[in-house]
Amino acid sequence: MANVQSRYNHLFPSPAAAFSGMYTGGLWTNNLGSWPGKANQTVEFSNGTKMTVETTASVMLDRGLDFSSGESLFQTACMPNKKSRPPDPRPSLAVGKPPYSIPLGGPSMYPDPIIHHKKDFVRGYYLHEERLEDVAVLQLPTFRLIGESPVSLARVAVQFLERARKDGKEKLIIDLSNNMGGDINLGFNLFRILFPDKPIYTATRFPSTELIGLMGRVFSTSQGNEAVEHDNTLDLPLVFQNAVTPDHRHSFGSWEKLFGPVEIAGQNMSHLHATYNFTTASTEDNPISGYGGIEFGPSTQLFHAENIIIMTNGICASTCTILARLLKQQGVRSIVFGGRPRAAPMQLLGGSKGGQYWSLVTISHYIKKAREIAVNASGAGSPILSEDELARFLELAPPPLTGFPIRIDSRGGSGVNFRNEYDEKDPTTPLQFVYEAADCRLFWTAENYVFPESSWVAAADAMFGDASCVEESDGHHITP
């Protein structure tokens, strides 16, 4: 999480986390391998009683801690040998029984939905309070669809929204709490389902470094294009033929027209371009309604923007932030729950607002592939790079991850933000560095934890009724 308020929420239990397979107990009880700073923690309750909890560690290596010395442990865990297997960056939960019960989560904590996806990736509800009988809730806890088609999720969302309107619901809460992202086409498609006549604007830049400049030249050739077409692991923004302007009206005539560089805050960056070409990316299996000749969902807008609110607990990243920002650009209001116990604004989106994440594995793979193409082309007598340029490429390019003297993350658990995302009104400041407070903030209550649906009632009362937000928290949002 990128901001302190969301990190604070991440410490505590979240019933919504279970829908995406995340740990429901909060990082305070399981810090995923990070030392919390103390051998024990003391919690004091409001009635004055105290409880001390000891910090314990668990081992995620396949063979456990069956090592005779520190050297043997180092050889197994740190050295790049084929016989040993590195720990998974997303390990299973701690082995053994903790001296406490892990909080429940997922469907068992929520009321029965009106309609839901078979794996609960989408759930729809109605509020039953008399004053809120016109409010529907669309819960989207994840876009990470392992083994599921994006169409199946989008179809359930459409069915619920159309049924809600048929049943007289005029207001909609979109609950994105604990949504850490996933399939990006799905996020774009959901936006178009809600606003079918609104175009999607996305703007990104990548750093125009010398190495990226050479890689782009390699991948933009016929040899590079052929390699990309035959390798489905290459998902590159470095092929100028695939890039389009943010409004999708123009393409780039050459690599140089995409690469730039443009100097921004002393850094060389590329020209603005869309996340990708929606027309070519929209398919029957993973559609973006209105693009690529595919229509999905209602042809007219079902809910007015002023009657829609986005709700999060700040734990929203990747595709979640993209969907939320697109909705905000249409005038949809937002509410956030939790954070530190002080009267102040809180950001709606606490996760990454970058344009594209590249793992170290991805970076290594792309560099390796560019190196192969460039070297083979020179060897075949049809060089892409001059002799000096190829020598410079080989000088700049790091070795494969397996070529480092100690093991470097080889499972995609580490990486960097490769592309920055920008707002249409500010093409120079990355969104990652833009403070965007929610329109309203509420603190969690004990009832919200025990009965999560009560948070929807509180959100509806604050945004559609006369209930108050946390003092000093409203009126600080950035107008779309």
UniProtKB/Swiss-Prot annotation:
Residues 78-97 are annotated as: Disordered. The keyword Protease applies. It comes from the Eukaryota. Pathway: Mycotoxin biosynthesis. GO terms for molecular function: serine-type peptidase activity. Keywords: Hydrolase, Protease, Serine protease. Its EC number is 3.4.-.-. Residues 134-336 are annotated as: Peptidase S41 domain. SUPFAM superfamilies: ClpP/crotonase. Peptidase S41 family protein; part of the gene cluster that mediates the biosynthesis of the secondary metabolite ustiloxin B, an antimitotic tetrapeptide. First, ustA is processed by the subtilisin-like endoprotease Kex2 that is outside the ustiloxin B gene cluster, at the C-terminal side of Arg-Lys, after transfer to Golgi apparatus through the endoplasmic reticulum (ER). Cleavage by KEX2 generates 16 peptides YAIG-I to YAIG-XVI. This is Peptidase S41 family protein ustP. It comes from Aspergillus flavus (strain ATCC 200026 / FGSC A1120 / IAM 13836 / NRRL 3357 / JCM 12722 / SRRC 167). The lineage of its organism: Eukaryota, Fungi, Dikarya, Ascomycota, Pezizomycotina. The gene is ustP.
